[in-house]
């Protein structure tokens, strides 16, 4: 039987994009898109091998942002606008890691959804 032809990853040439950082209490997901929202690269703390409570650390968020930035720079990305969503601990370190990886951060926008008193929040933890 003939070998299935592998689809080559097309190298897009995009100068500027948007870095979406989704920081939850359990994980941090960094997705880099073009200005229209088409994904160029993504990474998360869990995808890098962090498990359990280590996923929610600022260091894990930093590593996820670096990995996403590296693979986005292969497509020619140079500048990003950053949108941050969620209350997680990896918000600041992910933004710093994007800048340290060589991407120029032009704007930082907080798009955390705030309920107008919607669903009941989880009960308080008693440790």
Swiss-Prot record:
PROSITE patterns: RIBOSOMAL_S11. Gene3D superfamilies: Ribosomal protein S11. Disulfide bonds: none annotated. GO terms for biological process: translation. GO terms for molecular function: rRNA binding; structural constituent of ribosome. Keywords: Ribonucleoprotein, Ribosomal protein, RNA-binding, rRNA-binding. InterPro entries: Ribosomal_uS11, Ribosomal_uS11_bac-type, Ribosomal_uS11_CS, Ribosomal_uS11_sf. Coiled coil: none annotated. One of its GO terms (cellular component) is ribonucleoprotein complex. Part of the 30S ribosomal subunit. Interacts with proteins S7 and S18. Binds to IF-3. NCBIfam families: PRK05309.1, uS11_bact. Located on the platform of the 30S subunit, it bridges several disparate RNA helices of the 16S rRNA. Forms part of the Shine-Dalgarno cleft in the 70S ribosome. Belongs to the universal ribosomal protein uS11 family. This is Small ribosomal subunit protein uS11. The gene is rpsK.
